[in-house]
Regions:
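A glycine- and Lys/Arg-enriched "phosphate-lid" helix/loop adjacent to the NTP-binding pocket
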Residues: 119, 124-188
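P-loop (Walker A) phosphate-binding loop of NTP-binding proteins
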Residues: 18
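Conserved lysine of the Walker
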Residues: 23
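Hydrophobic anchor at the beta1->P-loop junction of P-loop NTPases
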Residues: 15
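NTP-dependent small-molecule kinase module
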Residues: 3, 169-248
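ATP-dependent small-molecule kinase phosphotransfer cores
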Residues: 48-135, 142
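Hydrophobic positions on the alpha1 helix immediately C-terminal to the Walker A/P-loop
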Residues: 26
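Extreme N-terminal, non-catalytic leader segments
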Residues: 1-12
């Protein structure tokens, strides 16, 4: 706890949503406004700083399922095959990978809360992995409840809702039917896990204002507490993979 004021409480925030929902834009806007307020903001990228066993994910998406690599754009659409591949064996693999990531989340959150940051922003969180699962399966629902109770819960979990058709036009990587199903999964999670703030599909500047107001509301109340019972983990993996390769 060296270097931290005893009365200091770090605000933990996460951003989630389907691909193309505008998370990067809103994260940048919130970070800039909070920094302008004189707050120390730290950004943690889930795929870079939290996710583990990234080589397995890259292999399954590209070599096994023959999906494209990289990040899609309107001028260069791609066809990814990773988190949109639904099967019994893949669900079992995801159960394992997501639990490993959950352990990593606990370690990363504990480290972040010991830093001098006033606000810690997660670019994606455990919720983005759980939204890849088939929630119609009772075993899957039990697993989701278990993992949701295992990871530290952000004080504010933003869900940027988006029209799948518009999202895919901005970031063409996955089939439209998957994006519709993925959106419904996110909304279902938001209704079951406390702490979500759903931002409806509205113009960027209006969404940014809603995001900022919610963060400032939480900061002004300061009714926050550090997640307890965090466990340790091994040192960070020095190998860095890009988000484009590991979204299993």
């Amino acid at each position: 706890m060296t270097g931290r004021r005893e009365d200091k409480r770090t605000l933990l925030v996460s951003f989630s949503g389907i691909d193309g929902a505008g998370k990067s834009t809103q994260i940048e806007a919130l970070s800039s406004r909070l920094a302008g307020d004189g707050l120390r903001v730290r950004l943690i990228r889930f795929w870079d700083d939290v996710a583990r066993l990234k080589g397995i994910r890259e292999t399954s998406g590209h070599r096994i399922f023959k999906g494209d690599q990289g990040i899609g754009s309107p001028s260069a659409p791609i066809n990814r095959r990773d988190k949109n591949v639904q099967s019994g064996p893949m669900t079992c693999i995801r159960f394992f990978l997501y639990f490993v990531d959950a352990v990593s989340v606990r370690r990363v959150v504990r480290k972040a809360l010991r830093s001098d940051a006033d606000v810690v922003i997660f670019d994606r969180y455990t919720w983005d992995e759980l939204a890849n699962l088939n929630m119609r399966n009772p075993i899957v629902r039990a697993y989701i409840r278990m993992l949701a109770s295992f990871v530290p819960r952000p004080h504010v979990s933003y869900l940027l809702d988006a029209d799948p058709l518009q999202a895919r036009s901005r970031k063409p990587e996955y089939p439209l039917d998957f994006l519709y199903a993925n959106r419904e999964a996110y909304l279902t999670l938001a209704g079951q896990i406390p702490g979500f703030t759903v931002i409806a599909p509205i113009p960027i500047h209006e969404a940014a204002q809603q995001v900022l107001e919610r963060a400032r509301e939480e900061l002004s109340e300061r009714k926050v507490s550090r997640p307890e019972s965090l466990i340790g983990a091994s040192k960070d993996d020095s190998n860095r993979y890009t988000e484009a390769n590991i979204r299993v």
